[in-house]
């Protein structure tokens, strides 16, 4: 059975991370002694670190501790009109959802890294802490930093974002590439006023380091009634935008982006599309 550590505070947890680095696996909300854990890993049960397990609501600001697992995120996330709940449910099936912590999903090597796509749409910020201090980064700056490598012992301890307006409609979808070589995901938000799309925002994660807004696709549906033609056209424009930025023209990737964006938009608009 792997060694299990039970820190009770963020400083204690940070010290363990600085000492053991990539040998660690953080878990929360499960019994690490009774569940199957990877061999060769030092298991850190962060259940006792209260700061990492809080979902805090202060006026219009939501803060979610990164120690919660994706199962809890799928059940209890708030202020995002169901966006993070959708994403957590889609990217992690029920068999593993309670084993994967939010902080593990924020690792670029994680198969659950698509949780960052809705975070970009929410314009979230990430709080980090290390043995040398604290800092807060925008989600885009965090994604660039974490891909290059965070400071030794540094840990994302919380994600915060502004509450969405109650009339904002949201959607998320993800598809996996054949052969297990990564994923494509999209997140979108908009208002629907008498079936007309108002102030749409669409974020796509595919071939680029940081999920990107596809403004041409947004323009295609803005101010127009929800319909299948606009959805299909927006998917095509989004694919073209992403492929141009990635400086490639891959027919398979183009199809995946088109499908992902269309499914995301359709999930928002389906009740408003004429039959």
Give residue ranges: language-model regions:
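C-terminal structural segment of proteins
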Residues: 1-275
């Amino acid at each position: 059975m792997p060694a299990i550590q039970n820190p009770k505070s963020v400083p204690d947890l940070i010290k363990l991370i600085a000492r053991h680095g990539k040998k660690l696996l953080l878990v929360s909300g499960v019994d690490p002694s009774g569940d199957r854990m990877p061999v060769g890993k030092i298991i850190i049960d962060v259940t006792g670190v209260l700061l990492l397990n809080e979902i805090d609501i202060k006026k219009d600001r939501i803060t979610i501790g990164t120690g919660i697992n994706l199962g809890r995120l799928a059940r209890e996330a708030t202020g995002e009109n169901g966006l993070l709940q959708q994403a957590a449910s889609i990217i992690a099936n029920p068999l593993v959802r309670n084993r994967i912590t939010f902080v593990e999903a924020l690792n670029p090597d994680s198969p659950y890294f698509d949780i960052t796509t809705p975070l970009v749409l929410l314009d979230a910020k990430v709080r980090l802490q290390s043995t040398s201090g604290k800092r807060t980064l925008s989600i885009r700056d965090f994604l660039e930093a974490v891909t290059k490598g965070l400071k030794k012992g540094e840990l994302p301890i919380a994600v915060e974002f502004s509450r969405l307006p109650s009339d904002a409609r949201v959607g998320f979808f993800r598809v996996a590439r054949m052969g297990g070589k990564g994923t494509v995901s999209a997140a979108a938000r908009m208002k629907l006023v008498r079936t007309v799309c108002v102030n749409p925002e669409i974020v796509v994660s595919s071939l680029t380091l940081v999920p990107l807004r596809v403004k041409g696709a947004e323009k295609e549906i803005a101010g127009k009634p929800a319909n299948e033609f606009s959805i299909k056209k927006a998917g095509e424009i989004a694919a073209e935008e992403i492929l141009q930025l990635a400086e490639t023209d891959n027919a398979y990737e183009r199809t995946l982006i088109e499908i992902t964006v269309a499914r995301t938009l359709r999930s928002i608009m389906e009740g408003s599309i004429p039959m």
